[in-house]
Amino acid sequence: MIAAQAKLVYQLNKYYSERCQARKGAIAKTIREVCKVVSDVLKEVEVQEPRFISSLTEIDARYEGLEVVCPTEFEVVLYLNQMGVFNFVDDGSLPGCAVLKLSDGRKRSMSLWVEFITASGYLSARKIRSRFQTLVAQAVDKCSYRDVVKMIADTSEVKLRIRERYIVQITPAFKCTGIWPRSAAQWPLPHIPWPGPNRVAEVKAEGFNLLSKECYSLTGKQSSAESDAWVLQFAEAENRLLLGGCRGKCLSVLKTLRDRHLELPGQPLNNYHMKTLLLYECEKHPRETDWDEACLGDRLNGILLQLISCLQCRRCPHYFLPNLDLFQGKPHSALESAAKQTWRLAREILTNPKSLDKL
């Protein structure tokens, strides 16, 4: 048994140093190329409208606010200033979303975003995005990369196609620190010792983001009130939780397997599903020793089996917001074929670790 585990860990480490590192290198090169274009577009936006200041900065070879959806698709979060005059209201009526309401006694004119406040005093995510979309469209025509970048039409999101190969979504957002959403109040679960009180305090202080984008749970049926809502995002909190042990390596292997074998019609699975299931695996195995290098094979196997279970049940709850289903709106047939393909993959890796040389 121990020999079989050791063989799997050896093969996974080999896979990590060959396949995963090559993937990381290729993506890093793409990110540099894409960010040159996006920075140029955002610089042009800022000239037209100084309220939209580019926050895309490189820190320690990483771009703050950039998320890799898949090797050809990225999301850049553009942090906006001055949320101060609004209260954060999160009553759970829209899973995964919250609203920003003008604080009592505050005048509209005190807000930097006065013309985007609705009659009932809400700061409209949709109105801000619509204005930003117009500015980006103008900037694309003026910027020095105009020959290689185009706006993607037929969407309320701000999406660019770069060199006909890459898609970048630029999402206006507010950073919320020092508060924690009521809809995530059940975290951490009281009977689970992970991640421990110090890490919990760090994560809650890190806070979350409010994004101006279409909400998972409302796609295709948004009323105007609902489309004024902001989408909750916890990227920094999640990244902080995944520090230490073989968690990062495990995520890297999962993303590489997804890119190479689970990029299926109907797009049932993305990197975020993998990250979510890794967080649940951390809860199931709360001891740090469960995340030693020698346990990499067991952890990966556990996550793949959990993924199959979620695909078969057609439900994948968000880690912090369990009322939000990350499979919402995905075609059942796509989830079914992803379950079959994941099962083939898991069986292959478990029964024949050497197959990783070909995967």
From Swiss-Prot:
This is Protein mab-21-like 2-A. Belongs to the mab-21 family. It comes from the Eukaryota. One of its GO terms (biological process) is eye development. Required for normal development of the eye. May promote dorsalization of the developing embryo by antagonizing the ventralizing factor bmp4. Functional antagonism of bmp4 may require interaction with smad1. Required for gastrulation and subsequent neural development. May function as a transcriptional repressor. GO terms for cellular component: cytoplasm; nucleus. Keywords: Cytoplasm, Developmental protein, Nucleus, Repressor, Transcription, Transcription regulation. InterPro entries: Mab-21-like_nuc_Trfase, Mab-21_HhH/H2TH-like, MAB21L/cGLR. It is found in: Nucleus; Cytoplasm. It holds the Pfam family Mab-21_C. Its main location: nucleus.
